[in-house]
């Protein structure tokens, strides 16, 4: 199926491989797939999605397959690879997996018993009261660190908890406004009554 371009070269539109039997019976200028050939048959593994061919004037134009067709082809290839590796679906040679499975452990490992009475983690503590007071909330590690830091500061002589935090923290006392010039800027030329701080 070739048409001549104005430059004299032939444009080949057929895909490599055997031609369908219905393609021999069609006219050379007919566009589209043979009736009932590609629409009903499933693509084989590695086969390209057929491009839509339409005739525009004297030229045959092929359109690229849609993105949905490309995505479906990619999904089919991925499923085929997973099936081949035995990770997807039930193969005909696999035994029925609906029964109870037996678990095999690697050498050197023992199975944990699943009884609810046993704890997976045991805490070394003398009493349960100590455990409750020490870990009182979800932020237990932060509380413990805070207690340790405050205890260390009290031992070193810093009494941070005894000084209230509501005092002004200005270490440099403000200057008295006794001078005739404005201390914030030089715009008011000495008239401090008209100057306002913003």
Curated annotation (Swiss-Prot):
Record keywords: Phosphoprotein included? yes
Region described as Disordered: spans on this chain = 1-58, 83-146
List residues modified as Phosphoserine: 14, 91, 125, 127
* Composition-biased stretches (Polar residues): 134-146
Listed InterPro entries: FAM219 (IPR029339)
Which residues are listed as membrane-spanning?
Answer: none
Q: What start-end ranges are recorded for coiled-coil regions in this protein?
A: none
Q: Which UniProt keywords apply?
A: Phosphoprotein
Pfam families according to UniProt: FAM219A (PF15260)
Q: Does the keyword Phosphoprotein apply?
A: yes
Give the similarity note.
Belongs to the FAM219 family.
Annotated PANTHER family: PROTEIN FAM219A, PROTEIN FAM219B
What name appears for this protein in its UniProt entry?
Protein FAM219B
Q: What is the lineage of its organism?
A: Eukaryota, Metazoa, Chordata, Craniata, Vertebrata
């Amino acid at each position: 199926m070739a048409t001549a371009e104005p430059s004299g070269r032939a444009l080949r539109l057929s895909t490599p491989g055997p031609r369908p039997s219905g393609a021999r019976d069609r006219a050379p200028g007919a566009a589209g797939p043979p009736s009932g050939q590609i629409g009903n048959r499933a693509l084989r593994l590695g086969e390209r999605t057929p491009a839509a061919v339409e005739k525009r004037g004297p030229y045959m134009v092929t359109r690229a397959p849609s993105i949905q067709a490309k995505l479906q082809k990619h999904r089919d290839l991925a499923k085929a690879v997973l099936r081949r590796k035995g990770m997807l679906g039930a193969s005909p040679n696999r035994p029925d997996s609906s029964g109870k499975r037996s678990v095999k452990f690697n050498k050197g490992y023992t199975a944990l018993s699943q009884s609810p009475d046993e704890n997976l983690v045991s805490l070394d503590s003398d009493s349960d009261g100590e455990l409750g007071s020490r870990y009182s909330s979800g932020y237990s590690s932060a509380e413990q660190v805070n207690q340790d830091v405050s205890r260390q500061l009290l031992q070193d002589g810093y009494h941070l908890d005894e000084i209230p935090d509501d005092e002004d923290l200005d270490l440099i006392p403000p200057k008295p406004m006794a001078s005739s010039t404005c201390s914030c800027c030089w715009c008011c030329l000495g008239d401090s009554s008209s100057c306002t701080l913003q």
